[in-house]
């Protein structure tokens, strides 16, 4: 504990009410957030002579200040604790690293409803189905729904400005409600109802209604209509046969946990209306010395109680671990949801099978993750040996991408001891250089990246320069001129020249621009990690360049038209669903866009045609 922190004096001021406490280090950084039913009793436990663990000892040794927030109830304290954890990301708390809100399928409340993927706050009028484990699961479901129930998925701006049906109508993936006369209001409403039932898990009702309609069409000698409905029935049956369905139609989240070698995996299985929508594995950041019970309690609290997560709470949560605060968690979730939420730890029947499945998935995912990390550690250790460094904890790699010198983008990719650190990948738009001058581009990106203060932990041990001797010379020149408060001599600059025909395994490495290069055997683990980060950097640069090029392509044609400024360009692209939609639009359709007169619409039409 810091000499400046007087624990005895502080504890005299602490109340015995419930609340939340925040611990700070000498730098004023929050290092731990906790909650307590009795603040005085809980905080006193930190300053006993016999502390529970080394983790607690390390924490207490750094305390410089403690702030306390008193709450009315334990539930308030629990909610506030997890909001503070999200805000401060304290070093000694278990942290849920995935902060994305879950995607839903959104069925809008329009006259002709549309289907779309949705994340975030649910402000738009309509119905939300989910949550789904990831965006891929939503897109896959939307593609399936489009084949079975062809209701529109286009944006309202596109829908409102169409005078003729799009390609989706031509291939039978949309009923074309945008054009009068293509589909009756009754038929469209019926298909929307099928979608609603299907997404609610009521497949049997969908099939019953479809079979009745098919039989009626057949009796009326409407054989084409009967055949179309028959195909719908078969499609629905094919989908439902593939799903693992429980005997009950409950909404459940099932949470399995695995813990090994200081790493935890929490696997969440999402079940809605008795069907498994999907699952996701999480690897929370676990401080050393943390016990499994704390990992599970903190994860579950953060997973459901951090307000911005926008999670939809199921009626029941199944856990394979007993929580000391299970009742408090259930009460907090109940208060949050406005309905009773049960937390179960010893289920039977189907629920026990689900829990076993989640536990198995957690163990499998953790084994895979540890194996990947072991491989990365071996490769970095081999690289450190080759480069004669004590260790390689952090690497950064740079690459340049452009087309004939235009839209130049530089990428910076970061690897740490566990591999790619994608949250720290960066792209830089390069400007003010001679088109096609890769040396100037490399010079600029390195100055922008390193010509400023850098945290000690973020100084790379190795900087890879993709491009060989010339690019390495630029890097050496930049670092020689840097005037920065950190140790600019710490990073080892390494040039990587592509092999003949750009074949993997034939790379040449350079320590000095004028020196002789050297190669590593094709089966060298050190070479493999160099190839990995180099390929990541290359892909990241190309991805940024393509986005930039596409943006220029979408706006450059419109920029040449007199009277079409940035706001009108944006409005045109928004209402027409992009440049291609605008190219296909008639003068009358263009004139319907706000701010576009008939005369300007004609000018835009003819400019795009010629």
From Swiss-Prot:
Gene3D superfamilies: 5' to 3' exonuclease, C-terminal subdomain, GIY-YIG endonuclease, UVR domain, UvrC, RNAse H endonuclease domain. The UvrABC repair system catalyzes the recognition and processing of DNA lesions. UvrC both incises the 5' and 3' sides of the lesion. The N-terminal half is responsible for the 3' incision and the C-terminal half is responsible for the 5' incision. One of its GO terms (biological process) is SOS response. One of its GO terms (cellular component) is excinuclease repair complex. Its main location: cytoplasm. Residues 16-94 form the GIY-YIG domain. Keywords: Cytoplasm, DNA damage, DNA excision, DNA repair, Excision nuclease, SOS response. Interacts with UvrB in an incision complex. Residues 204-239 form the UVR domain. SMART domains: GIYc, HhH1. This is UvrABC system protein C. It is found in: Cytoplasm.
């Amino acid at each position: 504990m810091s000499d400046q922190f007087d624990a005895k004096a502080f504890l005299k001021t602490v109340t015995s009410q419930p609340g939340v406490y925040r611990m700070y280090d000498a730098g004023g950084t929050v290092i731990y957030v906790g909650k307590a039913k009795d603040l005085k009793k809980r905080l006193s436990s930190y300053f006993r002579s016999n502390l529970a663990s080394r983790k607690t000892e390390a924490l207490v040794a750094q305390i410089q200040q403690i702030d306390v927030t008193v709450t009315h109830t334990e539930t308030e304290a629990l909610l506030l604790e997890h909001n503070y954890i999200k805000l401060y990301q304290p070093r000694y708390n278990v942290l849920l690293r995935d902060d994305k809100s879950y995607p839903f399928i959104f069925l809008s409340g329009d006259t002709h409803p549309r289907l779309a993927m949705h994340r975030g706050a649910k402000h738009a009028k309509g119905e939300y189905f989910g949550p789904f484990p990831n965006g891929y699961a939503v897109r896959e479901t939307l593609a399936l729904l489009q084949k079975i129930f062809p209701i529109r998925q286009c944006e309202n701006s596109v829908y409102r400005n169409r005078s003729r049906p799009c390609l989706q109508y031509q291939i039978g993936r949309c009923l074309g409600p945008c054009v009068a006369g293509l589909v009756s209001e009754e038929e469209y409403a019926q298909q929307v109802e099928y979608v609603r039932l299907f997404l609610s898990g009521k497949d049997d009702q969908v099939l019953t209604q479809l079979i009745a309609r098919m039989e009626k069409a057949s009796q009326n000698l409407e054989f084409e209509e009967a055949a179309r409905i028959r195909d719908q029935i078969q499609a629905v049956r094919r989908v439902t046969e593939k799903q693992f369905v429980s005997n009950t139609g409950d909404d459940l989240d099932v949470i399995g946990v695995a813990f090994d070698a200081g790493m935890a995996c929490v696997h969440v299985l999402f079940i809605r209306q008795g069907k498994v929508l999907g699952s996701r594995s999480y690897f929370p950041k676990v401080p050393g010395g943390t016990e499994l019970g704390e990992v599970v309690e903190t994860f579950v609290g953060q997973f459901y109680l951090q307000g911005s997560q926008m999670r939809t709470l199921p009626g029941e949560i199944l856990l394979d671990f007993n929580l000391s605060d299970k009742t408090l968690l259930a009460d907090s979730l109940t208060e949050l949801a406005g309905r009773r939420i049960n937390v179960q730890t010893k289920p039977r029947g189907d629920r026990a099978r689900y829990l076993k499945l989640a536990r198995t998935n957690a163990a499998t995912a953790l084994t895979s993750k540890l194996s990947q990390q072991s491989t990365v550690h071996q490769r970095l250790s081999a690289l450190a040996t080759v480069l004669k460094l004590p260790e390689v904890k952090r690497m950064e790699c740079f690459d340049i991408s452009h087309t004939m010198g235009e839209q130049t983008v530089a990428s910076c990719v970061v690897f740490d001891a566990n591999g790619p650190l994608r949250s720290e990948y960066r792209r830089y738009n390069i400007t003010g250089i001679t088109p096609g001058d890769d040396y100037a581009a490399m010079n600029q990106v390195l100055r922008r990246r390193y010509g400023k203060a850098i945290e000690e932990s973020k100084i790379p041990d190795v900087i890879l320069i993709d491009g060989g001797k010339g690019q390495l010379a630029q890097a050496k020149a930049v670092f020689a001129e840097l005037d920065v408060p950190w140790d600019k001599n710490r990073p080892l600059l390494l040039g990587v020249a592509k092999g003949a025909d750009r074949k993997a395994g034939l790379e040449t490495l350079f320590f000095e621009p004028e020196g002789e290069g050297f190669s590593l055997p094709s089966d060298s683990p050190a070479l493999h990690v160099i190839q990995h980060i180099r390929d990541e950097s290359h892909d990241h640069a190309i991805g940024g360049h393509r986005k930039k090029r596409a943006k220029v392509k979408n706006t450059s044609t419109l920029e040449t038209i007199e009277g079409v400024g940035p706001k009108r360009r944006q409005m045109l692209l928004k209402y027409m669903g992009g440049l291609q939609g605008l190219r296909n639009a008639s003068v009358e359709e263009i004139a319907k866009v706000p701010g576009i007169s008939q005369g300007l619409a004609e000018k835009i039409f003819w400019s795009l045609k010629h």
